Amino acid sequence: MARTLPIQKTTLLKKEEVKKDWYLINAEGQTLGRLATRIALVLMGKNKPNWTPHVDCGNFVVVINADKIKLTGKKWDQKIYYRHSGYPGGIKEFTARQLQQRNPEKLIQLAVKRMLPKTILGRKALKRLKIYAGSEHPHSAQKPIELNF
């Protein structure tokens, strides 16, 4: 007679059971793409053991020193970002170096945004990302946990 194994039940979180933590990441000397993948995982909550795909169980992430990010190779001059106003001939293009000088937070935000899912949960996760160019941030009251990569 064949022995049957007990059926294991998958535990699914409800949105009331989710605890959102605050994490602090220092971007100084970090490579942009590698840092963005780790930030995206924490924002979606995939670093938690009880991650549930249909529930917003992500965390808050505070990134400091965004102006000291690193790009490999010749990407500072060869990587091009595009923006369009919606009017004919309204396309603008910027190199990574120009974008970094104009708005250093935007470089990390765009990299993380493009790694998140293009759904409602992805848009909610992006709102939990706080990026600052310097080493100061106004979220010390939340006591963020420092993540080292």
From Swiss-Prot:
Q: What keyword terms does UniProt attach to this protein? A: Ribonucleoprotein, Ribosomal protein
**Can you supply a Gene Ontology BP term from the record?**
translation
Q: Which GO terms describe its cellular component?
A: cytosolic large ribosomal subunit
Q: Which GO terms describe its molecular function?
A: mRNA binding; structural constituent of ribosome
Asked whether the UniProt record includes Ribonucleoprotein among its keywords, one would answer: yes
Matching entries from InterPro entries are given as: Ribosomal_uL13, Ribosomal_uL13_bac-type, Ribosomal_uL13_CS, Ribosomal_uL13_sf
Origin superkingdom: Bacteria
One Pfam short name = Ribosomal_L13
Q: Which family does it belong to?
A: Belongs to the universal ribosomal protein uL13 family.
Q: Give the matching NCBIfam families.
A: rplM_bact (TIGR01066)
Protein function: This protein is one of the early assembly proteins of the 50S ribosomal subunit, although it is not seen to bind rRNA by itself. It is important during the early stages of 50S assembly.
Oligomeric and partner information: Part of the 50S ribosomal subunit.
* Protein name per the record: Large ribosomal subunit protein uL13
Q: What is the lineage of its organism?
A: Bacteria, Thermotogati, Thermotogota, Thermotogae, Thermotogales
